Amino acid sequence: MKTYTLDITIAAQEDLERLYDFLSDQDAFLADPAISTIEKAYELLRFMPESCRRAHLQLEGHVYREMIVKFGRSGYLVLFEIQRDETVSVLAVKHQRESDYH
């Protein structure tokens, strides 16, 4: 089985911090489990990133994908790109109810 290198961009790390801060204000007991669930889901990207759907966002020469991470009654979306050197770059993370990536 092919294994990919995982690269979490600074923007994606900032998204996790933003989501954590929001959840901490809403329900402090959910913040840690939500972020932990997202971080554990990253492991799928190391082994089967092609199993995730293609994102609607497209730029010339780039194919972006989204991983759905279920949590509670909704969940989160992780935007990523598979690089030619077998690296998966996590670009952004958002709640499913957010209109767009930040």
Segments from the language model and where they lie:
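Basic, Lys/Arg-enriched alpha-helical interface segments
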Residues: M1-R65
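Enriched for short, Lys/Arg-rich terminal
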Residues: V69-H102
